[in-house]
Design a protein with these regions (language model features):
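Residues lining hydrophobic/aromatic ligand-binding pockets adjacent to catalytic sites
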Residues: 1-146
Length: 146
């Protein structure tokens, strides 16, 4: 399991963050790494993006592995090319982490309707960097509401 922290002191690279990371490591607890850069670096052109920019934490991205299953929560925006550009930094990190554990990657978007497009956009690059990722997960289609 993992813990996603939001208090600014846990991102200041000071004693509080060091104690947090040490404590998580000693207890074999993963630190969830939130990457909301796509949300906060884009123009808010949709109601979902406006809402996300107001609600999603804007915290520095600290790629820290505190246990054997590091967790990355990547929140993409509406612009898939921009998402791909910002995701590139994760390719090498996820591949490196895979050598010593099993990284977890959570991809989502402010408007859930864009989530399948985000997976389609990023998965080819992810698989090239980390062949063990395999094929993109199948996204079930809802045939009807009732």
């Amino acid at each position: 399991y993992g813990v996603e922290v939001r208090h600014p002191e846990f991102f200041a690279k000071g004693e509080a963050e060091q104690q947090l990371n040490r404590g998580l490591h000693e207890r074999n607890v993963n630190r969830v790494i939130l990457d909301s850069r796509p949300v906060h670096s884009a123009a808010a052109t949709s109601p979902a993006m406006i809402d996300a920019q107001q609600k999603k934490p804007k915290v520095p991205v600290h790629a820290v592995m505190t246990a054997r299953q590091p967790m990355v929560r990547f929140i993409g925006g509406d612009d898939m090319a921009h998402n791909r550009e910002l995701f590139r930094v994760w390719l090498q990190t996820l591949a490196k982490w895979h050598q010593s554990g099993t990284p977890w990657l959570f991809l989502h978007t402010p408007d859930i309707a864009f989530a399948p497009a985000l997976v389609d956009t990023l998965w080819g690059d992810l698989r090239a960097a980390l062949p063990a990722a395999g094929n993109a997960p199948s996204i079930p289609q809802q045939s009807s509401l009732f």
